[in-house]
Design a protein with these regions (language model features):
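Conserved ABC ATPase signature
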Residues: 161-165, 169
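Charged, flexible cofactor/metal-binding loops and thiol motifs
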Residues: 4, 12-14, 28-32, 248-337
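A short, proline-enriched helix->beta-strand linker immediately N-terminal to the Walker B motif
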Residues: 180-184
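Conserved ABC ATPase "signature" region
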Residues: 87-88, 138-156, 265-266
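Conserved ABC transporter NBD signature motif
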Residues: 80-88
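ABC ATPase NBD coupling module
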Residues: 30-35, 89-105, 123, 131, ...
Length: 337
């Protein structure tokens, strides 16, 4: 059956649209010395749709947490466009930014550090409602108790303190608090890396269930591709502030085309795809300083396949084999189906 344009299902508006995002920090070198400039994020673009998860992966220092701080409105990008619900954050007024902050919430790596140890769980959950709404105390308590149940905790937990819970339970509380204002986007910065493996699976399943039930979008920051495999729909691989490969998870995991992505996947037990390395790839060379990144490809100092062109010419992020990749040699890694 053919459907006319009028009968077609409407396309949902993206929760987040980022175009050429940059974040540059001014680094003081002391008296009488000119300041250095550290480019933590260099022209990164991506989109996050409702009900979908974009995982941002890479080593420490790659810029993924800086990206999370920009999307969560903790920092303002130096340049580029960042649209939340169609509103450009960079150009937004203070009043608009205040309203946008309700639509984006954070879940941190260490749940114990993000929960006030002197307050009961009920008070912690009610706090966002007390600050941002005009609900009375009874309504706030009802919503907080309902949220506890939604994340799998019991009614008696309402009057307990954070130190009385396990790490997994504390992360459930942190997730519940993030959901109190009914956000469209959750920015999860390494939300399970501090938990035992068995507890990680429970929290990941909870996040997946909440996404399906509430239509949430996730920006999921992680260095663990084993975790990303279970939670993500799309993947953005970063290195030294640059996006070097991005696309659908199933496409990239089955056949990574950037040598850095190949090395990350090869170092993760249990991930096997058509293009996955048969043995671990050992990266040689030093991780460059972000204050003085290499010319040409940012990965050229550690790449096992480097050629002369890699040192002199920076590869653009281009469409290839169902994803975007920034590598001069990417075609040689494509394997026949």
């Amino acid at each position: 059956m053919n459907l006319s344009t009028q009968d077609a299902m409407p396309v949902a508006e993206p929760v987040v649209v980022a175009r050429e995002l940059k974040q540059v920090y001014k680094i003081s070198r002391g008296f009488l010395h000119p300041a250095d400039h550290l480019q933590a994020v260099s022209g990164v673009s991506f989109t996050v749709q409702p009900g979908k998860t974009l995982a941002v992966v890479g080593e420490s220092g790659c810029g993924k947490s800086t990206l999370a701080r920009m999307v969560s409105l903790i920092e303002t990008p130096t340049s580029g466009e960042l649209l939340l619900g169609g509103v450009d954050v960079v150009k937004a007024s203070p009043q608009q930014r205040h309203a946008l902050r309700r639509t984006v919430q954070l879940v941190f790596q260490n749940p114990f550090g993000s929960l006030n140890p002197r307050k009961k769980i009920g008070t912690i959950l009610e706090s966002p409602l007390e600050i941002n709404t005009e609900l009375d105390a009874k309504s706030r308590a009802e919503q907080a108790r309902a949220m506890l149940a939604l994340v799998g905790l019991r009614p008696e937990h309402f009057d307990r303190y954070p130190h009385m819970f396990s790490g997994g339970q504390r992360q459930r509380i942190a997730i519940a608090r993030a959901l109190m204002l009914k956000p469209a986007l959750i920015v999860a910065d390494e939300p399970v890396s501090a938990l035992d493996v068995s507890i990680q699976a429970q929290v990941l399943n909870l996040l997946a269930d909440l996404q399906q039930e509430l239509g949430l979008a996730y920006l999921f920051i992680s260095h663990d591709l084993g975790v990303v495999r279970h939670i993500a729909h799309d993947v953005l691989v970063m290195y030294l502030g640059h996006a070097i490969e991005q696309g659908e998870k199933k496409t990239i995991f089955a056949q990574p085309l950037h040598p850095y992505t190949q090395a990350l996947l090869a170092s993760t037990p249990g991930i096997v795809g058509a293009g996955a390395a048969k043995k671990r790839i050992v990266l040689t060379g030093e991780l460059p300083s972000p204050l003085s990144p290499p010319g040409g490809c940012v990965f050229s100092t550690r790449c096992p396949h480097v050629v002369a062109k890699c040192h002199s010419e920076r590869p653009p992020l281009r469409e290839l084999s169902g994803r975007q990749v920034a590598c001069h040699l990417a075609e040689q890694f494509i394997q026949p189906a």
